């Protein structure tokens, strides 16, 4: 790629800066870490790898990067694309072969969404492989919009105030998942992917099928953002600014023991005596 335009340079710097801030804020990567970068062949994971490779060069700490792609044996999957790309970059990589495609097709009725089961099978396989290669962190390409969408999905359909944290210890306790693009918008990532002309691999497992619930939420957020620019960012900031005493979860705040503090200083004026 040739010299970047002013806007392209700003975009690149913004993504690198935001990823660096997220990594610092959540202590995602530490000195000596071996980071397994999970590549799907989509715009998000390509951008994540690109940004992490830059940060690896300029960071004040030393860490390894190992790229990993999971070949799920989908029909027509272009097996050559990622190896060729990673070889050209000179990045250490592994292709994990696991026929989850057949499992999903066997277990999920025709016409039903495959996303949930496919994701669980893929995640379990990658957790196991991360342990095998001694990876201390597992980097996923989820961005700010993914995190906000997941928050609303859980609220609307599961009745839970639960999102997708920038850093997470897996249920097995043996893997730490990080999301370096947590502060980055999908719009910026799409623009960067187009600019870099990454060799995108589409997911053909579900054909044209969409995860309908997620699409409903995505469309809602797009419409909100169109009418009120900055709303998605504001919602994301809210996830970082939680006040348990102002909600209703008894596990997070002790409402039952709440009583008057006899020694408290009055904060409000006695308007009757003014």
UniProtKB/Swiss-Prot annotation:
InterPro entries: Rossmann-like_a/b/a_fold, TilS/TtcA_N, tRNA_Cyd_32_2_STrfase, tRNA_thiolation_TtcA_Ctu1
Class in the EC hierarchy, top level: transferase
GO BP term, example: tRNA thio-modification
Entry-linked Gene3D superfamilies: HUPs (3.40.50.620)
Catalysis: reaction(s): cytidine(32) in tRNA + S-sulfanyl-L-cysteinyl-[cysteine desulfurase] + AH2 + ATP = 2-thiocytidine(32) in tRNA + L-cysteinyl-[cysteine desulfurase] + A + AMP + diphosphate + H(+)
Enzyme Commission numbers on file: 2.8.1.-
Gene Ontology CC terms, in alphabetical order: cytoplasm
GO molecular function: 4 iron, 4 sulfur cluster binding; ATP binding; magnesium ion binding; sulfurtransferase activity; tRNA binding
Keyword field: 4Fe-4S, ATP-binding, Cytoplasm, Iron, Iron-sulfur, Magnesium, Metal-binding, Nucleotide-binding, RNA-binding, Transferase, tRNA processing, tRNA-binding
Cofactor(s) recorded in Swiss-Prot or TrEMBL: Mg(2+); [4Fe-4S] cluster
Compartments where found: Cytoplasm
Binding site for [4Fe-4S] cluster: 115, 118, 206
Primary role: Catalyzes the ATP-dependent 2-thiolation of cytidine in position 32 of tRNA, to form 2-thiocytidine (s(2)C32). The sulfur atoms are provided by the cysteine/cysteine desulfurase (IscS) system.
Subunit structure and binding partners: Homodimer.
Similarity remark: Belongs to the TtcA family.
Further remarks about this protein from its record: The thiolation reaction likely consists of two steps: a first activation step by ATP to form an adenylated intermediate of the target base of tRNA, and a second nucleophilic substitution step of the sulfur (S) atom supplied by the hydrosulfide attached to the Fe-S cluster.
Protein name, entry field: tRNA-cytidine(32) 2-sulfurtransferase
Lineage: Bacteria, Pseudomonadati, Pseudomonadota, Gammaproteobacteria, Pseudomonadales
């Amino acid at each position: 790629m040739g010299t970047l335009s002013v806007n392209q340079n700003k975009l690149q710097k913004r993504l690198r800066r935001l990823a660096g801030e997220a990594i610092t804020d959540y202590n995602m990567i530490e000195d000596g870490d071996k980071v397994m970068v999970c590549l799907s062949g989509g715009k998000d994971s390509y951008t994540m790898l690109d940004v992490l490779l830059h940060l690896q060069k300029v960071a004040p700490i030393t860490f390894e990067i190992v790229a990993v792609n999971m070949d799920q044996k989908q029909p027509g999957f272009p097996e050559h694309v990622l190896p060729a790309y990673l070889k050209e970059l000179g990045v250490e990589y592994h292709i994990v072969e696991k026929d989850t495609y057949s499992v999903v097709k066997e277990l999920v009725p025709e016409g039903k969404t495959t996303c949930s089961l496919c994701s669980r099978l893929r995640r379990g396989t990658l957790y196991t492989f991360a342990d095998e290669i001694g990876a201390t962190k597992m980097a996923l390409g989820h961005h700010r919009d993914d995190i906000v969408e997941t928050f609303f999905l859980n609220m609307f359909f599961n009745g839970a105030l639960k999102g997708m944290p920038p850093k997470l210890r897996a249920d097995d306790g043996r893997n730490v998942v990080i999301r370096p693009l947590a502060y980055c918008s999908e719009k910026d990532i799409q623009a960067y992917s187009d600019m870099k002309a990454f060799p995108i691999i589409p997911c053909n497992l579900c054909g044209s099928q969409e995860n309908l619930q997620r699409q409903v939420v995505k469309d809602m957020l797009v419409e909100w953002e169109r009418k009120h620019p900055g709303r998605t960012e504001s919602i994301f900031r809210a996830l970082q600014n939680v006040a348990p005493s102002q909600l209703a979860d008894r596990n997070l705040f002790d409402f039952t023991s709440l009583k008057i503090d006899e020694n408290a200083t009055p904060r409000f004026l006695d308007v009757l005596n003014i």
